[in-house]
Amino acid sequence: MKEKLLEKFKELFGNADGVSLYFSPGRVNLIGEHTDYNGGHVFPCALTLGTYGAARKRNDRLVHFYSMNLDHLGVIEASLDELVNKKEYNWANYPFGVVWAFAEKGYTLDCGFDMVIWGNIPNGSGLSSSASLEVLTGVILKDLYGIDALSMTDLALIGQYSENNFNGCNCG
């Protein structure tokens, strides 16, 4: 998968110099679904299924998202100067919501970034495909922008905050 991500990144953005690679697993709750956001107990387990990403900083304020799973949608472009959910962003509202949540929490990004993803979690399967994408995005932002103060728990909570408040989805 590493080679395919880098190849697609190079095809889309001219080269793959300075690109970092990432992975975020999906998860299953062994004691049932929909208990997390209803205040119930959870017993999650990470999976080998997940979301892979390649990313690097840009020299402007633009953010480019591309999903190898949704080639027909092409590159989705957003701006750090307009952190709003737009219908035309489609699936990219999930990672862009994490960018928004970082800003809401006081972590501003000095420049944009390019990101290519591919995932093998079936959408709607209850295996947390959106959470995987949100945590992946959080890890990418933490790494690219040197935000060392954030823990993995912080990143998970930022993902939840973005999905609840930017995308309007009740999740845990």
Where are these regions (language model features)?
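ATP-binding N-lobe of GHMP and related small-molecule kinases
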Residues: M1-A131, V135-M152, L157-N167, C171
